Each structure stands twice: as structure tokens, then as C-alpha cells.
Amino acid sequence: MRLMHPLDPARLADWQIAAALEPGLKPIGQVARDFGLEDREIIPMGPLVAKIDPVPLFARLTQPRGRYIDVTAINPTPLGEGKTTTILGLVQGLGAMGLSVSGAIRQPSSGPTFNLKGSAAGGGLAQCLPLAPFSLGLTGDIDCVTNANNLAMVA
């Protein structure tokens, strides 16, 4: 017997699941406070996205550190489950066990945005939200890296 989730990935596209879940997301300031970060330690990039300012965080380097799981490479399945889906699944699973957990994933390249490879945002019920800002540049850092590389090539 298969358990049915109201947002069944077998019946709905990833974007439909994201659109249904995004209105219920916590504001990024609340997420940061839940992890013990102060407002001065984050740089909001809209209501749902922020960067963590490394300067005020240096004072925390003397505190005990948690555990770390590094997902560096994986052979994607035929359904496209790769590193991002694995990381998001780990975060969701450990969170369901009552652990305080976060995940860090790299910003996707523009290839997924233009449907040239996987979405790089996970999929189904294990995807990165908010989906559109994540897929379309998030904080703009990837554009800065691209421009720096282009400048280095012509200089």
C-alpha cells in the first residue's frame, strides 16, 4: 500500500509542489533566529532569502562545533536524483528526528534554468524553496563570479 501525500510527486510537477508550499514558508529572519543568529549576522535578500555575514560570526569560532556531512559527488538516478535532492532529503530526515539541522548547497548554474540538465533544486517533496529565486540567481553571487571570470579572460 502506497501512502499518498496531498502533494503527490507522482501526480504534480515540481513547480506545482513549490507553488503550493511557498506561501507557508517562514520569513528568513525567523529562520535565522531559530538557529540562534542575530539580525546583525544576516543580510536579507528579500523576505525568504539571506546571506550570512561572516564578520560577526567569527566570534562564534570558539564554540563547540556540530557534526558535518559532506555530499561531494553522486551518480544521479535515471529520475535525476542527485546531490541537491540527497542533501535536502538528509536535512528533512534529520529534522524529522528532532535534530537542529541546516544544509548548505551551492547556487545552480544557468544550465538547469534553461532546461539543459537537472533542476539543481532537488525535486518532488525534497526541493529547495523558494524555487524561482533559487533557480534564477538567488543572491546574484553567481553573476558576480561569471563576470569576474569573463573579466579575467579578457584582461
Pin down the residues of each PLM region:
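Flexible phosphate-sensing "switch/lid" loops adjacent to ATP/NTP-binding sites
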Residues: M1-A155
